A protein has these predicted regions:
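Short, conserved loop/helix-junction motifs that constitute active-site signature segments
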Residues: 1-3
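Radical SAM enzyme [4Fe-4S]-AdoMet core and its adjacent flexible, acidic
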Residues: 5-6, 10-134, 142-147, 151
Length: 225
């Protein structure tokens, strides 16, 4: 047994044409069919969707919610982040009021069929919402770069070079990675974005986390980049 209990599919909009604009023609129909197949096989499913300030209250997002409710599955909400094609761009990030609206949805939409809240964000941690980057979540890129989060393009070095545990300990000396920040630092914290993302928008990624965050150069064999 592979011990898989849930399969998540991306749904950019509950309007087929809008979803397919971001994917490929016919993609929406295939997502719906895939969700239904997973449920038929007795597994749980969910849909993941990216929200921006401009689409959060739009029809496409509302129809994602309607679809999820009709299937009894969870909606994993990913807020827009100023990275990748949106590197350093802040104009369509969610606002505090948008975040409150998402929390309102979590509190009022009830539970999915597996007993979990219908609405989920990676910052939701019971009564202690916080950014989990580096503390409860890390990412490894395709070529082995260790990142505090898949959205935060600051490398702690390659996993082949030195101890992952030591690199994480180095990261945790920085106060940005201590569970005290109640919002996503990459997508919601203006101070973090203005200090560590906007100034580097034209530079190749990933950046050196040790230099950017002034981390201790603790693990053996590392040389400054």
């Amino acid at each position: 047994q592979i011990k898989v209990d849930k399969v998540t599919f991306s749904m950019d909009s509950g309007i087929p044409e809008e979803h397919d604009q971001n994917r490929l023609p016919g993609s929406f129909v295939r997502v719906v069919a895939a969700v239904d197949l997973v449920l038929t096989e007795g597994l749980f499913s969910s849909v993941s969707t990216v929200v921006t300030h401009s689409n959060l209250h739009g029809e496409g997002f509302q129809k994602v919610l309607e679809f999820a409710k009709s299937r009894g599955i969870r909606v994993d909400i990913q807020i827009a982040e100023p990275v990748g094609k949106w590197d350093g761009i802040k104009e369509d990030l969610i606002t505090p009021e948008d975040a409150d609206y998402i929390k309102h949805l979590r509190d009022t939409m009830g539970q999915a069929d597996n007993g979990q809240p219908m609405i989920n964000r990676d910052t939701y941690c019971g009564d202690n919402d916080h950014c989990p980057a580096g503390t409860e979540f890390m990412s490894i890129s395709a070529n082995g770069e260790l990142l505090s989060c898949n959205f935060l393009q600051f490398s702690l070095g390659n996993v082949r070079d030195g101890s992952i545990a030591q690199k994480r300990r180095d990261l945790l000396t920085c106060s940005w990675f201590d569970n005290s920040h109640r919002t996503c630092i990459c997508g919601e914290d203006d101070e973090f974005i203005d200090r560590f993302i906007v100034p580097f928008k034209e530079e190749a990624k990933p950046l050196d986390a040790y230099s950017v965050f002034d981390l201790p150069n603790a693990w053996p064999g590392r040389s400054a980049q």
